[in-house]
């Protein structure tokens, strides 16, 4: 397993490039612009790190005993996007995509090396990201709130502002992008920033 130059990870098609697409966004802006751009870069990192992999590689659990795989992370992040923006913020009554009460780890356990499962995961993730992007763009400000019955901290009870939700999603992605780095390197030696 040969190590590939870091610059090779900066393209969605897996071809070498000195152009990191995450550097195309605004570098100056207000709070909303800054948060939205940080989240966009994290989402793009997920796509970049998974580019060029077949279903077998996407589903590979290469850090045993963990059931984590790149495909499982795509499914997990689709679930997080849905729960955060559709359910918590928009108040939609939506079923979970891959998990259930009887199968709480369905996002990872159901990440099998089937091309159809990979397509389904990416389609779900992109649909949830598209919804979230529209929701944030149309929100009048970052102070709008959603209700999270599990959030009992602070003076707002279960209320969370869009600002806090964006910070939380950036944290969620950032945590998992470290996992993605290691999983991808174990698959084919590719590394990147």
Where are these regions (language model features)?
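Short, contiguous alpha-helical
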Residues: 2-18, 22, 32, 36-106, ...
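Active-site rim elements
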Residues: 29-35, 116-119
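Acidic/histidine-rich alpha-helical segments that form the ligand environment
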Residues: 105-146, 163-169
């Amino acid at each position: 397993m040969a190590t590939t130059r870091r610059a090779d990870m900066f393209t969605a098609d897996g071809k070498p490039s000195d152009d990191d697409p995450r550097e195309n966004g605004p570098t100056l802006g207000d709070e909303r612009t800054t948060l939205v751009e940080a989240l966009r870069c994290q989402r793009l990192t997920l796509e970049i790190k998974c580019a060029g992999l077949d279903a077998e590689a996407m589903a590979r659990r290469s850090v045993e005993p963990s059931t984590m795989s790149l495909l499982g992370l795509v499914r997990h992040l689709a679930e997080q996007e849905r729960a955060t923006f559709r359910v918590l913020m928009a108040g939609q009554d939506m079923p979970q995509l891959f998990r259930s009460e009887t199968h709480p780890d369905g996002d990872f356990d159901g990440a099998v090396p089937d091309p159809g499962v990979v397509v389904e995961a990416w389609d779900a993730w992109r649909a949830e990201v598209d919804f979230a992007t529209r929701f944030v763009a149309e929100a009048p400000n970052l102070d709008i709130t959603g209700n999270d019955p599990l959030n009992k901290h602070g003076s707002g009870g279960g209320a969370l502002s869009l600002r806090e939700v964006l910070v939380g999603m950036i944290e969620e992605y950032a945590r998992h992008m470290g996992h993605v780095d290691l999983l991808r390197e174990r698959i084919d030696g590719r590394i990147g920033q």
